[in-house]
Amino acid sequence: VYKRQLLKKKMHAVKSMGRRFEREDENMTAMPEEETAIYFELGTKDSQIPAGKTVLDYSLDQLTSPDGGRVLAEHISLRIRGSEKICIIGKNGVGKTTLLKKIAKDLMERSDIRAEYMPQNYEDQLDLSLTPVEYLNTTGDKEEMTRIRTYLGALKYTADEMDHSIRELSGGQKAKVLLLKMSLSNANVLILDEPTRNFSPLSGPVIRQMLAAFPGAIISISHDRKYIMEVCEKVYRLETHGLVETNLQSEG
């Protein structure tokens, strides 16, 4: 019953955002579909985390490459409390994605938080053989399927895209599936690897605003300076000797 009430609230919010888009679209010059902005709400008051709660207290003596062939970094330590939003930056190949995968594995096994993960390769998390509706529907209930179709429609999926396998979708559409899953699961911790990279320039500001307003915690990797400045409260640079908190503004 609680889950259905939560879905109804989210459906109402998505419908309202869809109507808002339609009103604004009437006064705008027509643009290609891939440049269409999306309006999306992520999280509820139930996604809030008490300020004193330790979300992550992570330490690792050595971060090795996926094949175990070389040491990427040493003496890694990261602590996150409450609804902090942090970003890990660093040079390509330094091990950011490898580290985030390890953190995601630990957090998603926890029962005291509700963590969801957007990997760099969406295929690591998505079942490509399913349609978006099948992937998002957790109960098999027809009423829930109808709600999910309403959500997807508000996110500019065509009816055809809703019934095609996820494998056939664009990178941006796959990212939307993952974001919608995060919303429907009422996650309070988001683990995001380059979350803005597949969204159009028009949707980028909306995605950043949505993530900045998320009431839970965010642990992310990004090269997107706008995302880092607008969403993240703390920034850590991954160096060979560990994570170093840094001020992005001072780096120019």
Task: Label each region the model flagged.
Residues 1, 48-252:
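ABC ATP-binding cassette signature C-motif
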